[in-house]
Curated annotation (Swiss-Prot):
Keywords: Ribonucleoprotein, Ribosomal protein, RNA-binding, rRNA-binding. Belongs to the bacterial ribosomal protein bS6 family. Residues 104-116 have a biased composition (Basic and acidic residues). The lineage of its organism: Bacteria, Pseudomonadati, Pseudomonadota, Gammaproteobacteria, Alteromonadales. It comes from Idiomarina loihiensis (strain ATCC BAA-735 / DSM 15497 / L2-TR). Residues 94-116 are annotated as: Disordered. NCBIfam families: S6. This is Small ribosomal subunit protein bS6. GO terms for biological process: translation. Gene3D superfamilies: 3.30.70.60.
Length: 116
């Protein structure tokens, strides 16, 4: 099985449905023999540019280990779900389990950029 990083954006009016969507997609992954290494709900965030005249969207990040069939099933689910505005699935070399920079407190992020 391969490792993937998935980010999908949900219509801001459908934010209350996000926990159900996450549960549904998690079940799809687990039933296909996959594993979720990291799951982060980033909440509503400003978009870099308007999509369908919207300026905000609800973001969700998943790092999973799954077969290609499961990933194809997720892609199909994203495509036919009208609430999902955009999605991105990237193949990774290894699993990523540490928290993403977006979930760190702002003080920690400032310290990281100064140290670089």
């Amino acid at each position: 099985m391969r490792h993937y990083e998935i980010v999908f954006m949900v219509h801001p009016d459908q934010s209350e449905q996000v926990p159900g969507m996450i549960e549904r997609y998690s079940e799809t992954i687990k039933q296909g023999g996959g594993q979720i290494h990291r799951l982060e709900d980033w909440g509503r965030r400003q978009l870099a540019y308007p999509i369908n005249k919207l300026h905000k969207a609800h973001y969700v990040l998943l790092n999973i280990e799954a077969s290609a069939e499961v990933v194809e099933e997720l892609e199909t689910a994203f495509r036919y779900n009208d609430a999902v505005l955009r999605n991105m699935i990237m193949r990774k070399k290894e699993s990523i389990t540490e928290p993403s920079p977006l979930t760190k407190p702002k003080e920690d992020r400032k310290g990281d950029s100064e140290a670089a």
